[in-house]
């Protein structure tokens, strides 16, 4: 997307900022005889996507050059960004905003992930419903916010800081906990071959077989997103990116259906990739064509209730088909049930769009912290309650017990999110 820079000379610094249809001086490109880039219209400015993954180098930041008095006024009202000095002594304030309903979607989805990782009865329909469908929200939003940074180098720089390094860090942080848990359960430290199993599992994207096991299972989401980003980057280099992506989504459906029947593919990352690629591409297509932007509370509420109701009915049919041995129908119903759930949640988040809470924004920013560390707290809570209640078997929560436990876990992790924002941005993928 074209950078939205409106430069003005110091001689005109007391004039009001111009609109995108006005010019108050030559740009540096014009002075060098280079054709200036096409200006962005007002509609495009208001229609821009905001990067929820990188707030420092985002192309969705709106950089507007201001005269110095205007900048000082903005600073006095705490509306301006950092005062910077460019080579030609232009003053600007860096203004950036977030899409609030996307923050709500990410925050609710990550809370649902923690809730579903607390062991509960599989006989409770809505637990299975959330357990099966929650992740589609993350994949849709990841596709919706996907953008081209101009070069493979810049893309991989983002992937390195936003996905690869956090994946390695959170696996490394959890490994000492894995050793401590093994020691408590077995009365001693593991042998070398056993101790290396989770290491190999982490290096193989949380794979599990006779030689390795997942170290931090929920992190399968990060390599899956990385692979999807790379697929999109490769398809963009062709003239038929959407045809290729649609073909890959269709193939992923059949491979996922076959795997559900024959179980030939390993779990977690490969299976998650096959299952969620269509939702990622759907989000990407919506983002590229600037769809799903308008907010209308009454319409959004009706759509939310309708989509969730249809999704619940389809998921109940989906489970019935499984129990009656109708494998093909079972798989076919799974995808529309996911679509209904996805848009039901997103429309619900649009209803909440006018409610802006810093807590919700920080949960959205700190999604990686919660995904990467909540398993440690979940298993610790399970272990403590089993011993406190003298249970002879694994604990099984009721929903009204699991919900406050999940909120407590999120509250414990919240300070880590705040510390990461201020001092260790690598923890939140920056």
PLM features per residue range, with description:
Residues 1-87:
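Short, strongly patterned local motifs
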Residues 90-430:
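Alpha-helical transmembrane segments and their immediate juxtamembrane cytosolic regions
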């Amino acid at each position: 997307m074209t950078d939205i820079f409106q430069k003005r000379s110091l001689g005109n610094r007391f004039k009001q900022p111009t609109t995108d249809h006005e010019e108050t001086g030559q740009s540096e490109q014009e002075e060098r005889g280079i054709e200036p880039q096409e200006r962005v219209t007002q509609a495009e400015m208001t229609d821009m996507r905001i990067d929820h993954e990188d707030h420092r180098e985002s192309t969705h930041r709106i950089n507007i050059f201001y005269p110095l008095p205007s900048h000082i006024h903005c600073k006095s009202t705490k509306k301006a960004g950092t005062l910077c000095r460019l080579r030609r002594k232009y003053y600007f304030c860096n203004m950036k905003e977030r899409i609030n309903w996307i923050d709500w979607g990410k925050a609710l989805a990550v809370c649902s992930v923690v809730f579903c990782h607390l062991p509960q009865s599989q006989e409770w329909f809505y637990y299975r419903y959330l357990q099966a469908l929650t992740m589609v929200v993350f994949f849709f939003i990841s596709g919706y916010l996907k953008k081209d940074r101009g070069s493979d180098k810049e893309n991989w720089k983002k992937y390195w800081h936003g996905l690869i390094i956090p994946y390695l860090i959170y696996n490394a942080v959890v490994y000492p906990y894995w050793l401590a848990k093994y020691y408590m359960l077995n009365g001693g430290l593991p042998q070398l071959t056993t101790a290396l199993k989770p290491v190999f599992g982490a290096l193989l994207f949380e794979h599990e077989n006779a030689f390795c096991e997942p170290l931090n299972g929920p992190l399968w989401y990060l390599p899956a997103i990385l692979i999807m980003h790379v697929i999109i980057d490769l398809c963009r280099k062709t003239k038929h990116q959407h045809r290729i992506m649609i073909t890959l989504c269709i193939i992923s459906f059949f491979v996922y259906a076959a795997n559900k029947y024959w179980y030939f593919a390993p779990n977690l990352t490969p299976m998650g990739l096959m299952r969620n690629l269509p939702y990622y591409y759907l989000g990407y297509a919506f983002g590229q064509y600037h769809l799903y932007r308008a907010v209308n509370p009454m319409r959004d509420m009706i759509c939310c209730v309708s989509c969730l109701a249809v999704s619940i009915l389809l998921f109940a049919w989906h489970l019935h088909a499984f129990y009656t041995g109708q494998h093909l129908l079972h798989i076919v119903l799974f995808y529309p049930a996911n679509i209904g759930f996805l848009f039901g949640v997103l429309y619900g988040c649009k209803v909440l769009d006018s409610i802006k809470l810093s807590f919700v924004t920080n949960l959205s920013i700190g999604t990686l912290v919660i995904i990467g560390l909540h398993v440690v707290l979940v298993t610790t809570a399970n272990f403590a309650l089993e011993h406190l209640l003298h249970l002879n078997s694994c604990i099984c929560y009721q929903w009204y017990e699991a919900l406050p436990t999940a909120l407590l876990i999120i509250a414990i992790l919240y300070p880590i999110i705040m510390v990461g924002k201020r001092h260790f941005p690598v923890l939140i993928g920056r």
